[in-house]
């Protein structure tokens, strides 16, 4: 089953990430949150700790339907492996939201 992956990194905007996850799951979409830190526990911009479903290394990008990067921080640009995968995904014409 195709999956929507939403990336979480320290300082992410909680409402942008959790609101999207909630709406997609209510709609029956397979969505997984992905930690870009060294732990599944990720702290957002308002000090709310969230437990991600997966670590970045666990993703099978061939199963991705869409990639989402919530706002709140510029730290996403520091994660080189994620940037590489997102660019490759976008260059294939796949859906990326930020």
Show which residues each predicted segment covers:
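Extended, subdomain-level signal for the structured scaffold at the beginning of enzyme domains
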Residues: 1-96
